[in-house]
């Protein structure tokens, strides 16, 4: 693998580090704070996604960028599931998820992850890949295949469901919990906008 420095990786690395601290913070409080364990796992997934994108940008050749572009799908495929589980647990204390429900939620992401790492064989995630250079910025420029759009819709459904859980809890929570939910909603809104800009190629 070949890498080169790019200033664009610094915010992504900062996000990965912050996500790591959030993961540790949440995991240490998993026994006393409702949903803390899911928050820790969600933060880890977000951190992996950010780190993968940073390494994709820093990659100096196509194979390196492709490898780290694919690696991001570990986070891409787990963030929506973990978000809806965390939102449910956070919004409704005592709520849990059964193993059967977890398996059902994981089917599409698992298929997506397999397709991402084998996309050269079928083009269902990326039908074409090249390097995009804009000034000092360098990243993958991909044409998305059919399954990418299938998973995009699925992930938006999960993100929307989790957002609904948080919104619904605003009517039932007050004080600190209400402020926490508002912060969560703002964070999700930023994530939605960022993802839409990526999908639209902006």
Enumerate the language-model features and the residues they cover:
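Individual alpha-helical transmembrane segments in multi-pass integral membrane proteins
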Residues: 2-20, 30-132, 143-160, 188
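Interfacial "cap-and-anchor" motif at the non-cytosolic start of specific transmembrane alpha-helices
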Residues: 5, 9, 36, 40-41, ...
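Structural signal for the C-terminal ends of transmembrane alpha-helices
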Residues: 24-31, 88-93, 166-174
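Hydrophobic alpha-helical transmembrane segments
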Residues: 25-28, 113-118, 195-202
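A broad "ordered helical/assembly scaffold" signature
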Residues: 126-127, 139, 177-178
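Surface-exposed acidic, glycine/proline-enriched linker/cap segments
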Residues: 136-142
């Amino acid at each position: 693998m070949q890498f080169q420095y790019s200033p664009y990786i610094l915010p992504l690395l900062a996000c990965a580090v912050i996500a790591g601290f959030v993961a540790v913070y949440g995991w240490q409080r998993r026994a006393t704070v409702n949903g803390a364990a899911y928050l820790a796992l969600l933060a880890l997934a977000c951190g992996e996604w950010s780190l993968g994108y940073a390494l994709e940008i820093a990659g100096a050749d196509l194979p390196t960028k492709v490898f780290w572009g694919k690696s991001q799908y570990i986070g891409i495929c787990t963030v929506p599931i973990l978000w809806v589980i965390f939102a449910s647990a956070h919004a409704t204390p005592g709520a849990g998820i059964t193993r059967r429900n977890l398996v059902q939620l994981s089917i599409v992401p698992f298929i997506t992850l397999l397709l991402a790492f084998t996309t050269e064989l079928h083009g269902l995630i990326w039908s074409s890949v090249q390097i995009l250079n804009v000034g000092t910025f360098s990243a993958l420029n991909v044409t998305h295949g059919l399954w990418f759009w299938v998973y995009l819709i699925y992930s938006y459904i999960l993100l929307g469901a989790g957002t609904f859980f948080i919104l619904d809890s605003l009517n039932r929570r007050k004080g600190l919990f209400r402020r926490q939910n508002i912060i969560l909603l703002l964070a999700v809104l930023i994530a939605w906008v960022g993802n839409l800009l990526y999908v639209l190629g902006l």
